[in-house]
């Protein structure tokens, strides 16, 4: 009977400790990366905008992408999909290719900052998923983007 009590006590302790454990993602939730919280990176600062027919990353996005790189390096189990998008000008085929170049530019930037290739995948939606509907420069500028989707 004493042996059974000890076994049950040990098993119960292990179960309680296992229930208290948290995942790596949970542990990073309160941390800051480059001055940004994980929630901000995933919801507010997850978009890089591009100029017309461009796919180079402008300086204003370096700090944000550095923060994403720091987060991804600190949480190697985390994965992100970089979604490349364009405005409606150009042929669908051209826009798919341009959206892919935008997504690849972000992926290569993150890779250069030490993020593992398996953590980042890319997809191009071209003009198919506009952030803003409209046929003017204000709408177009919001649609020329790459989104980091966690």
Curated annotation (Swiss-Prot):
It is a lipid-anchor. GO terms for biological process: cell division. Pfam families: OmpA. It is found in: Cell outer membrane. It comes from the Bacteria. Residues 1-19 form the signal peptide. Keywords: Cell cycle, Cell division, Cell outer membrane, Lipoprotein, Membrane, Palmitate, Signal. GO terms for cellular component: cell outer membrane. Its main location: membrane. Residues 37-150 form the OmpA-like domain. The keyword Signal applies. A lipid is attached at residue 20 (S-diacylglycerol cysteine). The Tol-Pal system is composed of five core proteins: the inner membrane proteins TolA, TolQ and TolR, the periplasmic protein TolB and the outer membrane protein Pal. They form a network linking the inner and outer membranes and the peptidoglycan layer. Belongs to the Pal lipoprotein family. This is Peptidoglycan-associated lipoprotein.
